[in-house]
UniProtKB/Swiss-Prot annotation:
This is Large ribosomal subunit protein bL12m. HAMAP family: Ribosomal_bL12. GO terms for cellular component: mitochondrial inner membrane; mitochondrial large ribosomal subunit; mitochondrial nucleoid; mitochondrion. The gene is MNP1. Component of the mitochondrial large ribosomal subunit (mt-LSU). Mature yeast 74S mitochondrial ribosomes consist of a small (37S) and a large (54S) subunit. The 37S small subunit contains a 15S ribosomal RNA (15S mt-rRNA) and 34 different proteins. The 54S large subunit contains a 21S rRNA (21S mt-rRNA) and 46 different proteins. Residues 1-33 form a transit peptide. Glycans are attached at residue 34. It is found in: Mitochondrion.
Length: 194
């Protein structure tokens, strides 16, 4: 059978099974194009005039590079006197959110108990885990554990361990940091928490 005959047959079959626009109901078309599940809702009715000053700031910020944005954030934190809050690797902790709010005025207008909090030394809850050294006899086990902790390849983990002293993880919660330290010390490594 030649290609020409095969093409004619497949084209005639396609023409017979093709759905024409007249066969599609108008309900299907309107449902498809008016569906809110696939498109974002339109807020054209709720458009408020934007101050040109704000519009210009938005335009300028949206054109910044990542480094420029980081500089902007740091400068705003300095100018607005916003404290640096470090988040642990495990995620959001409710205690960490309230820790920086000691001197913020309450809804009654009273200042927080900032003097009382400054008198008590704060217990450190976030640590940096540092691999100081390791026992050469258990080097392979330490490499395997570091590989699992950091998600590195075997070669990367070997280079990492051999470059000790080196920081393993930063901003680790106290419990996790102690677990990592105990695990690595059981394998013959010397680990410090900072």
């Amino acid at each position: 059978m030649s290609l020409r005959i095969l093409a004619k047959r497949s084209s005639s079959i396609w023409m017979k099974t093709r759905v024409t626009p007249a066969l599609i109901s108008p309900i299907t078309i309107t449902t498809r194009f008016n569906s809110t599940t696939t498109t974002a809702p339109s807020h054209k009715d709720d458009v408020r005039p934007v101050d040109p000053k704000i519009s210009k700031i938005v335009q300028d910020i949206s054109q910044l590079t990542l480094l420029e944005t980081s500089s902007l954030i740091n400068e705003l934190k300095t100018v607005l006197n916003i404290p640096e809050i470090s988040m642990p690797m495990g995620g959001f902790m409710a205690g960490a959110a309230g820790a920086g709010a000691g001197n913020v005025p309450s809804s009654t207008g009273e200042a927080g108990s900032g003097a009382e909090e400054e008198a008590k030394p704060e217990a450190k809850t976030v640590f940096t885990v540092k691999l100081d050294s390791f026992d050469t006899k258990t080097k392979a086990k330490v490499i395997k554990e570091v590989k699992g902790l950091l998600g590195l390849s075997l070669v990367e983990a070997k280079k990492f361990v051999e470059a000790a002293p080196k920081v393993l993880k930063e901003n680790v919660a106290k419990d996790d940091a102690e677990k990592i330290k105990k695990t690595l010390e059981d394998l013959g490594a010397k680990v410090s928490l900072e």
